[in-house]
Amino acid sequence: MLDLKKLRSNTEEVKKALSNRGEDFDVNVIDEVIALDEERRKILVDVEALKKQRNEVSAEIPKRKKAGEDVTEVMAEMREIGGKIKADDAKVAELNDKINYIMLRIPNIPNPAVPEGETDEDNVEIKRWGEPTKFNFEPKAHWDLGTDLDLLDFERGGKVAGSRFTVYKGMGARLERSIINYFLDKHTFENGYTEVLPPYMVNRDSMTGTGQLPKFEEDAFKVENNGYFLIPTAEVPVTNMYRNETLEGDKLPIKHAAYSACFRAEAGSAGRDTRGLIRQHQFNKVELVKFCKPEQSYEELDKLVQDAESVLQGLGLPYRIVRICKGDLGFTAALKYDIEVWMPSYNRYVEISSCSNFEDFQARRANIKYKNSPKEKPQFVHTLNGSGVAIGRTVAAILENYQQEDGSVVIPEALKEYMRCDLLK
């Protein structure tokens, strides 16, 4: 959520910044919300005047009673003033609802470093690590390798649940689990994160706090009988752990690493990477979440990207980093980097991690603040998160990049102690 004061004081600047944001968003609603806020502010001034008048009239009652005077008219005036205050309070509550409805649907303001552009083709590559894997044979796709090696069962996943669900079997299940453990060990022992194992279901307030609701409700899986939502990412429960809290400034930054299953309806994604493990309704991921002071957040974003890189480098997987353009930035981020791993069967890089700085956008929605001393006025924290990284896509990348001509797959050195083998065959 944006700062309403900023909308009032920098209206045209904000409208310009949001005009090519890539969201289905009409900048004219900013004028609407400002008009509603002005109306609310005028009524609040009237309410304060009425309360002052009521206090003055109220003070007259004991004086008149003491003097033996009739207070009937004064009491009637009190009731009239009270009725006006009640009516104005109702108007303010109605205006608050209208303002909040609009504010929850206004996207974040892009950082000046965000490139211009409309689609993912306009994202700017800023780094490559490793070289795309070359083969002296025709490489297989990960879904064929997984099936041939009896690691992945797409058919039975479809039978028990539906399309875009997968059963991991035998060494495939062990590979998934080994990657999870490797990522968590790397981030907690080497990168300084505290591990969290969060709930996989959250309430509506949590989904609103991180920005999934109200805009993206159609992409969420909802438990209809009690209002819970299955989490699309551990970002949601981990960020909302601190909802409506004021943190101690000297404890920042707070850094959490969380493994979870993730659940996404992926509405509108038909035909896009729907074969194999790339786009699933249920998948595992290790998420990195940070809470920091505003002046720390862009340095912490750089470190977050490096932490996500570290696990891919440890696995020897070639990747590149792109800075996301305005039109592809999404709803909540002020600045975002995607890390894309090389996938031989696609002959291109495929996203495996997104690392974002939300500045105070989520903190305002979730009311997460900090202060450096007990007497200091609380300020909103900045929140960041990044995939550290997606597990299923890592499985796919390992199968494709480490495959051998005979159809076997070499285990990356970093995973051998977890897998207790050197080769999948």
From Swiss-Prot:
Q: Which Gene3D superfamilies match?
A: Bira Bifunctional Protein, Domain 2, Serine-tRNA synthetase, tRNA binding domain
- Where are the membrane-spanning stretches? none
Q: Name one GO cellular component term.
A: cytoplasm
Top enzyme class: ligase
Entry superkingdom: Bacteria
Q: Which GO terms describe its biological process?
A: selenocysteine biosynthetic process; seryl-tRNA aminoacylation
* Pfam family name, one: Seryl_tRNA_N
Stored InterPro entries: aa-tRNA-synt_IIb, aa-tRNA-synth_II, aa-tRNA-synth_II/BPL/LPL, Ser-tRNA-ligase_type_1, Ser-tRNA-synth_1_N, SerRS_1_N_sf, SerRS_core, tRNA-bd_arm
What the entry lists under SUPFAM superfamilies is as follows: Class II aaRS and biotin synthetases, tRNA-binding arm
- PROSITE patterns assigned to the protein according to its UniProt record, in alphabetical order: AA_TRNA_LIGASE_II
GO MF terms, alphabetically ordered: ATP binding; catalytic activity, acting on a protein; serine-tRNA ligase activity; transferase activity
Q: What does the record give as its pathway?
A: Aminoacyl-tRNA biosynthesis; selenocysteinyl-tRNA(Sec) biosynthesis; L-seryl-tRNA(Sec) from L-serine and tRNA(Sec): step 1/1
Its UniProt domain note says: Consists of two distinct domains, a catalytic core and a N-terminal extension that is involved in tRNA binding.
**Name of the featured protein:** Serine--tRNA ligase
Native source species: Clostridium perfringens (strain ATCC 13124 / DSM 756 / JCM 1290 / NCIMB 6125 / NCTC 8237 / Type A)
| Recorded name of the encoding gene | serS
